[in-house]
Amino acid sequence: MNTQANITLSDIRMMILCGYPLSIEEYGHCYYDGDGVTRSTEEAYVWYRVAQWAGNHSVDSLVDYIGPTLTTSKCLKLSSRAKHIYTRALRH
C-alpha cells in the first residue's frame, strides 16, 4: 500500500479548536500501524508532535519511544514540521 492520508489544514484546525487532540493522535496511530496508509514511524512522530502542540500529552510516551530511533537532526526536522503544521492550521 502506497497511500497518504488526506487531511486538510481546516480539518486539523477544527480538531485543535474543538478540543479533539485525540483525533490528531489517532492520525499518528494510522501512520504508526500502517492502517489505511503507508506505515511510517517518521510520519507518526510528526502527528504525535502535532497532538502535543494541541495539548494532548498522552502521546508523550509515544514521542519518547520513537524519538531515540531517529537521529537528532531528523527529530528536530520532524518536530519543526509538526510545529509548522500546527501553527498553519491555527492561522488557516
Label the predicted regions.
Residues 41, 48, 63, 79-82:
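Inward-facing hydrophobic residues that define packing positions of alpha-helical scaffold repeats
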